């Protein structure tokens, strides 16, 4: 009799544990992920703080360049120039974007480095109510027709992603 009672207790415990675990799975499956918006050339992203628009950022173009630096240590497969612009709408601090804010990824999934190519437009500090633009050159490790650009808007984890064709 004790054996039957013990066996029944084990079976009931097993069923109750199975029921609990399937409920947890349902809760996990019901959670939805927020999909990150991917931006393209010419699309402006807005950085907000405390519900107020602070900065607008736009990638204007990504182009190939045949410019090579004979003194560069790296020999990339392809060199590109990213042309971008930004506007300080209402940030109390001056706004400045440069390669420090960017992570460039080629089609092979390689994180790429800046390259010492000639650029024509240098970014400037932008006080509230002003705009600036800039260019950054990157050496791609793999020949690519497009890149992914991750832009760090404020150094506190507010990032946006661009997928950009190379012209």
Residue ranges and their predicted role:
Residues 1-4:
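Positively charged n-region of N-terminal signal peptides that target proteins for export
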Residues 11-12:
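Repetitive helical segments and hydrophobic/amphipathic motifs
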Residues 15-19:
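C-terminal motif of bacterial Sec signal peptides marking the signal peptidase cleavage site
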Residues 20-167:
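Conserved functional micro-motifs across diverse proteins
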């Amino acid at each position: 009799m004790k054996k039957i009672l013990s066996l029944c207790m084990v079976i009931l415990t097993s069923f109750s544990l199975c029921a609990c675990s399937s409920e947890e799975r349902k809760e996990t499956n019901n959670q939805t992920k927020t999909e990150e918006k991917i931006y393209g050339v010419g699309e402006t992203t807005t950085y907000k703080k405390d519900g107020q628009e602070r900065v607008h950022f736009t990638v204007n173009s990504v182009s190939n360049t045949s410019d090579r630096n004979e003194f560069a240590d790296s020999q990339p497969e392809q060199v590109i120039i990213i042309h971008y612009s930004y506007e300080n709408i209402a940030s109390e601090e001056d706004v400045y974007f440069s390669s420090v804010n960017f992570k460039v990824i080629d089609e092979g999934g390689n994180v790429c480095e800046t390259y010492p190519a000639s650029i024509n437009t240098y970014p400037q500090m932008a006080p509230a109510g002003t705009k600036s633009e800039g260019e950054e050159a990157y050496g791609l490790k793999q020949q690519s027709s497009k890149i992914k650009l991750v832009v760090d808007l404020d150094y506190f984890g507010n990032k946006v992603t661009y997928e950009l064709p190379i012209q």
